[in-house]
């Protein structure tokens, strides 16, 4: 049976822990040859988990990416994107120099020419339509340092900064912070984990932590892994309210009133009972 048809998630851990060297990874080099590499500590930018990686490079060439065993977030774990996705930095058709469009076609330009052209165009548009007409769009894949540098440049131009994947955070409205109130390692010391709309494929490292917690005795329940998720969540919330165990939450009365007409099904009641009786429970969801 081909490996790709098995439960393999292409994380590369088998290669990393192989004690004999029988398993080896393919390198980005055309010809296999020993090279002296420089190791650089970095953070994976493929998702928001923030796994620590050690990139090995030789000159301008990236050779391999290894998960950092001492990483506070991933502790030596990595997903397929973090382990193998570094080669996107060396794509042959990757844009490396500025291009200027003239007469419907692009031509190469140096950075000075590009900066001057952008500044003049921005000044022209702002003078005609106002400063609010200028915006700088950045990728959510940027590092904090890159995003900060782009923000400073936009401020100098008097422009807005737009992120291409900047969705409104529901978590911030509930907790007041657009970040998890718990750490990933707390998954390993909990009794119950509710996976609400969470797909393992979206975050393999978190999924591995959940699997470790389950092997240590934690109960894992998958909730709303499909359609009609909001209806089931309302039923679970109504069951908890009907139990009388949740009365001190901010905005409780208005929330309880909004659920008065909700009828609680058997599945929702079962989930609510398990959740309320757990000594330590965590909810994992994909926003």
Regions found by a protein language model. Name each.
Residues 1-12, 16, 21-38, 58-61:
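Ferredoxin-type iron-sulfur electron-transfer modules in oxidoreductases and energy-metabolism complexes
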Residues 31-287:
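Catalytic alpha/large subunits of respiratory electron-transfer oxidoreductases
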């Amino acid at each position: 049976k081909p490996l790709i048809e098995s439960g393999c998630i292409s994380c590369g851990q088998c290669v990393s822990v192989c004690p004999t060297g029988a398993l080896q990874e393919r390198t980005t080099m055309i010809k296999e040859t020993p090279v002296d590499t420089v190791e650089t500590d970095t953070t994976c930018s493929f998702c928001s988990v923030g796994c620590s990686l050690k990139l090995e490079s030789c000159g301008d060439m990236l050779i391999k990416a290894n998960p950092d065993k001492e990483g506070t977030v991933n502790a030596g774990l990595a997903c397929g994107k973090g382990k193998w996705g570094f080669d996107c930095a060396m794509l042959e058709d990757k844009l490396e120099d500025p291009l200027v469009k003239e007469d419907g076609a692009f031509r190469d330009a140096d950075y000075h020419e590009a900066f001057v052209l952008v500044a003049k165009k921005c000044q022209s548009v702002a003078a005609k339509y106002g400063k609010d007409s200028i915006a700088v769009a950045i990728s959510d894949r940027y590092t904090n340092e890159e995003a900060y540098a782009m923000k400073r440049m936009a401020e100098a131009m008097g422009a807005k900064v737009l992120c291409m994947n900047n969705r409104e955070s529901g978590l911030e409205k509930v907790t007041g912070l657009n970040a998890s109130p718990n750490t990933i390692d707390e998954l390993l010391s909990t009794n119950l984990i509710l996976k609400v709309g969470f797909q393992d494929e979206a975050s393999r490292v978190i999924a591995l932590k959940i699997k470790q917690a389950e092997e240590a005795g934690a109960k894992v329940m998958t909730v709303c892994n499909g359609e009609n998720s909001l209806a089931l969540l309302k039923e679970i919330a109504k069951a908890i309210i009907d139990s009388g165990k949740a009365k001190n939450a901010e905005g409780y009365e208005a929330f309880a009133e909004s659920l008065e007409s909700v009828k609680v099904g058997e599945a929702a009641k079962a989930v609510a009972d398990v959740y309320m009786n757990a000594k330590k429970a965590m909810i994992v969801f994909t926003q």
